[in-house]
């Protein structure tokens, strides 16, 4: 993985993904020991779209590893306003840093960036396409809650059309297999066909599509809530009509298993009531912490800096 870009998780083997999760656990329990792992390294955060958690998470990850951070938050602060291409920006920034993370509203922008850069590029979300590091955070949370990331019934609820975190998670869970997906959405926000095709191509995975959350919540091990994304709509009336379709509150949670985990990539609007936050099934703020840890694992890995005392799960496989 050293020197490699991470645009999607498809470029990583399942063992490499598991090792990143294992490495994140190690980092969490060895904060002081790993604090100088990336001394002298510089991360560039190129965020052409607004972000709070993801950008701060990437930046904090590098700072906690001993490195430094440069970058911008908002396309209006970049030379794109002067007409500069993504490729030219990446060719330039590559001369300054050891690793780049990019968020962009256009699908495929991260791939363009990775091809232009001379240093590793990590995709922090490209339009409605993929969000690989959020998926790593999701997997780390499932691993922490259940001790596994297979043999689960996973409900995904809300905006399944534009939700890049949903697409990334489904595709990655299919690689590990033995997952039943329950896709909960209005007809206007159904899962894209290419994601459905991915499920169908996996013998050990299956799916159902439903509109009513209450009718299926009792069957779920995991409920992955998403917001309806206003920024993806061209018509505000459509957004307002669909925004309140699914709201998870304590009343609905009474129908769920005591062991169910509620995940959300954040930010939320109103799709999870605040009173759910104190329920032990609420795992979305754990995801935030896990997101920073997996980004620490990924950043240190792609620049080739070894964590002191860490032993990989399978050295030959994960170093490929």
Residue spans of the language-model regions?
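Positively charged, low-complexity intrinsically disordered leader regions
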Residues: 1-56, 60
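Phosphate/diphosphate ligand-binding glycine-rich loop within oxidoreductases
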Residues: 36-143, 270-272
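Phosphate-coordination loops involved in phosphoryl transfer and adenosine-cofactor binding
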Residues: 37-43, 150-154, 178, 259
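Glycine-rich phosphate/diphosphate-binding loop of Rossmann-like nucleotide-binding domains
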Residues: 48-61, 144-225
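A short helix->loop->beta-strand "cap" motif at the edges of active sites that frequently abuts
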Residues: 119, 177-179, 255-261
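Rossmann-like adenosine-cofactor binding region
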Residues: 199-276, 281-282
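Adenosine-phosphate binding glycine-rich loop
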Residues: 259-260, 265-320
């Amino acid at each position: 993985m050293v020197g490699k870009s991470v645009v999607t998780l498809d470029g990583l083997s399942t063992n490499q993904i598991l090792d990143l999760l294992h490495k994140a656990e190690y980092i969490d329990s060895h904060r002081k020991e790993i604090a100088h792992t990336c001394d002298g390294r510089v991360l560039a955060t190129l965020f052409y779209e607004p972000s709070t958690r993801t950008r701060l998470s990437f930046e904090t990850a590098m700072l906690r590893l001993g490195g430094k951070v440069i970058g911008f938050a908002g396309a209006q602060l970049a030379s794109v306003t002067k007409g500069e291409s993504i490729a030219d920006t990446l060719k330039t920034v590559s001369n300054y840093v050891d690793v780049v993370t990019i968020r962009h509203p256009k699908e495929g922008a991260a791939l363009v960036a990775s091809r232009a850069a001379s240093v590793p590029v990590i995709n922090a979300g490209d339009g409605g396409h993929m969000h690989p590091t959020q998926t790593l955070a999701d997997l780390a949370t499932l691993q922490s809650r259940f001790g596994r990331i297979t043999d689960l019934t996973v409900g995904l609820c809300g905006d399944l059309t534009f939700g890049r975190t949903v697409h990334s998670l489904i595709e990655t869970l299919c690689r590990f297999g033995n997952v039943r997906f329950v896709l909960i959405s209005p007809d206007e926000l159904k899962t894209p066909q290419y994601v459905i095709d991915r499920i169908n191509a996996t013998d050990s995975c299956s799916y159902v599509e439903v509109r009513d959350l209450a009718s299926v919540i009792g069957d779920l091990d995991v409920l992955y809530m998403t917001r309806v994304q206003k920024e993806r709509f061209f018509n505000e009336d459509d957004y307002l009509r669909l925004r309140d379709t699914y709201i998870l509150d304590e009343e609905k949670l009474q129908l769920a298993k005591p062991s169910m985990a509620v995940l959300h990539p954040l930010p939320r609007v109103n799709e999870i009531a605040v009173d759910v936050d104190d329920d032990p099934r609420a795992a979305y703020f754990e995801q935030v912490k896990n997101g920073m840890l997996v980004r620490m694992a990924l950043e240190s890995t792609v620049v080739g800096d070894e964590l002191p005392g860490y032993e990989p799960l399978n050295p030959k496989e994960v170093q490929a």
